[in-house]
């Protein structure tokens, strides 16, 4: 099955615009007329991504980042990419993978403690409402977190610190905008002169495709999609690999590593992030009602069975 997909152009979407540029909390925020309304607080009554707010999840989340920042090294990421990039663990369809995630809750997320299928459908449906003609973006919303299947026993039952959480480049200096930055000081790469400078193992404008990111569900699903020859546009693959890269799309860090294609795709990632982050709620989606639509998109952009 071969489908030719043109790269989407954000500027061509009527009644939508990306305002601002560079970093910052409001950088490139999507402006929608009568579209998705950003809620004031998360399911726990706190501001979204508030890692200091007292809540029942605060200690769990901080301990997660402590272990994550200590162990996500350049060598560790290379080993994990080599192991899981072979996509030889099993074969299954996209929807089968979605159902596997039902039993998992993300320990790095301060905003939600519901099974992952709820978040996937909330994200996809919110995007679908505001971007009805961008079916590739609906599907990207549905599958962006499927790499969390690494938590399942069939995939080695990896610890959460190596599957979820904000991502960041390894092989160069850790930026101070990273959540709980202080714990990087215990990472072996922190004092390695070959890996702790601004560019480290990379060069200016080398392109994020050439940068190793901390290992987790983002990079894994990106590898799975590429190895199974998805026909999603490059913006979809960019969203999958970098949707947890908050230092970039929230704070504007690490932009010196990006090339021109990355900068164009970043516009779509910032659009996507609004739905990924703010659609999290305790409202339930009728799975059986929306399943036929998403099954049609899966058939359009992926083979029936994927190698994982």
Curated annotation (Swiss-Prot):
Domain of life: Eukaryota
Cofactor: Fe cation
Compartments it resides in: Cytoplasm
Residue sites binding Fe cation 1 per the record: 119, 144-145, 276
GO-annotated cellular components: cytoplasm
Binding-site residues for substrate, renumbered to this chain: 49, 106-108, 148, 165-166, 243-244
Keyword Metal-binding attributed: yes
Gene Ontology MF terms in the entry: inositol oxygenase activity; iron ion binding
BP term (GO), one: L-ascorbic acid biosynthetic process
EC number: 1.13.99.1
Catalysis performed (reactions): myo-inositol + O2 = D-glucuronate + H2O + H(+)
Main localization (coarse): cytoplasm
Family that this chain belongs to: Belongs to the myo-inositol oxygenase family.
Known function: Involved in the biosynthesis of UDP-glucuronic acid (UDP-GlcA), providing nucleotide sugars for cell-wall polymers. May be also involved in plant ascorbate biosynthesis.
Name used for this protein in its record: Probable inositol oxygenase
Species annotation: Oryza sativa subsp. japonica (Rice)
Lineage, broadest ranks: Eukaryota, Viridiplantae, Streptophyta, Embryophyta, Tracheophyta
